[in-house]
């Protein structure tokens, strides 16, 4: 039995540095994670959830989380809504696709139509509320992507066709280092809220 250890190097026939097993040359590809979620609405109001987990515990968000194996992006978005805000929604068209290379995530955010105003906190949520767009406390939102999704939802209100948005112009993407450890992907501070 050999000890498993990896080192970062460029594998043969590749162009990027990757973790490679020092014994068998197995390449451990580091790929972005897919996050799925929905801007859920009922009668012109949007559903927000107060996070009860880190990062950004106590801040407001839309229902979203990591996609699971064996589900479509739409199924994942519906599951996240059920888990976080105890609500069944009709998942509509794709609202936005945000690529955030600094934290290795691709966010697929859908429109979610609520059949009623019923909602409740799930296991990762301490509070839920339906709010009008002009009542959103923008300083209390957990992540820049939540702000983008809510604004894109407002801007595309009434348009049901496939019209996905992307990361807003002017957002600075910080590249990952080519060598060494990956940066801390913890919560964003107020000073780097629009730097992703």
Spell out what each predicted region is.
Residues 166-168, 172-173:
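Extracellular, disulfide-bonded carbohydrate-recognition/adhesion ectodomains
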Residues 16, 31-35, 41-43, 55-57, ...:
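Short connector loops at helix/strand junctions that flank enzyme active sites
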Residues 41-83:
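Conserved Nudix-box catalytic region and its N-terminal flanking loop in Nudix hydrolases
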Residues 33, 51, 141:
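Surface loops and adjacent helix of pleckstrin homology
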Residues 18-20, 39, 48, 109-111, ...:
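Conserved hydrophobic/aromatic beta-strand scaffold that supports enzyme active sites
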Residues 1-38:
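Acidic, metal-coordinating catalytic segment for phosphate/diphosphate chemistry
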Residues 67-152, 156, 160-162, 175-176, ...:
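Unchanged
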């Amino acid at each position: 039995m050999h000890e498993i250890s990896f080192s970062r190097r460029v594998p043969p026939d590749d162009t990027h540095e990757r973790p490679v097993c020092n014994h068998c040359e197995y390449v451990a590809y580091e790929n972005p994670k897919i996050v799925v979620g929905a801007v859920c609405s009922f009668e012109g109001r949007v559903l927000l959830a107060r996070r009860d987990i880190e990062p950004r515990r106590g801040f407001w968000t839309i229902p979203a989380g990591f996609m699971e194996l064996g589900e479509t992006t739409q199924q994942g978005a519906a599951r996240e809504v059920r888990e976080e805000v105890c609500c069944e929604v009709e998942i509509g068209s794709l609202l936005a696709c945000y690529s955030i290379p600094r934290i290795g995530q691709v966010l697929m955010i859908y429109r979610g139509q609520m059949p009623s105003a019923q909602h409740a906190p799930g296991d990762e949520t301490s509070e839920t509320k339906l709010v009008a767009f002009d009542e959103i406390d923008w300083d209390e939102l957990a992540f820049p992507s939540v702000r983008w999704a809510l604004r894109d939802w407002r801007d595309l209100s009434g348009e049901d066709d496939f019209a996905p948005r992307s990361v807003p112009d002017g957002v600075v993407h910080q590249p990952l280092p080519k060598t060494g450890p990956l940066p801390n992907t913890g919560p964003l501070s107020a000073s780097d809220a629009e730097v992703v």
